[in-house]
Regions:
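N-terminal targeting sequences that direct proteins away from the cytosol to non-cytosolic compartments
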Residues: 1-147
Length: 147
């Protein structure tokens, strides 16, 4: 499936480049794992798509926090590659929105773990700004600060 029409559709959809960059950089990194390898640590990824070849329970399901937190898992079941490709196409906008929101929430969580609490910007410029402690001041003049 990974080298066929379904795999190409997945790669084309999820590895679409960011707009506006001077070079192509895919929105998401993809890792294809065989079912025998998909256990333990592999299940702790934030965003997972599982394809099941089966005639029962066909369709698309989106599950939050199935094996880890935060996590979005898409379960796509179909009797063959064409049916799974159909379910993927029918639901890819929902899947992309869910993954994007999951990534946004995780980035915010990570950024707010260690915030810069320097009151200098509030004292000097009268603004209150929140940014990660990992950011540093590049240039600091009388009326300008570049972080």
């Amino acid at each position: 499936m990974w080298e066929g029409k379904l795999g190409n559709n997945i790669k084309e959809t999820l590895m679409e480049p960011y707009e506006g960059l001077p070079f192509d950089e895919p929105k998401y990194d993809l890792y294809h794992l065989q079912p025998s390898i998909f256990k333990g640590f592999a299940r702790s990824s934030r965003n997972i798509i599982v394809f099941n070849k089966d005639t029962l329970g066909q369709g698309f399901r989106l599950i939050k926090n199935l094996w880890a937190r935060p996590q979005v898992t898409a379960l796509i079941t179909g009797e063959d590659e064409d049916v799974m490709n159909f379910y993927f196409d029918e639901n890819k906008d929902l899947l992309l929105r869910s993954i994007s929101e999951n990534e946004r929430v995780e980035k915010i969580r990570r950024m707010t773990k260690s915030l810069n609490d320097d009151p200098q910007l509030k004292d000097r410029f009268g603004i209150n700004i929140t940014f990660p402690d990992a950011y540093s001041t590049v240039k600091d003049t009388t009326n300008f600060v570049w972080i």
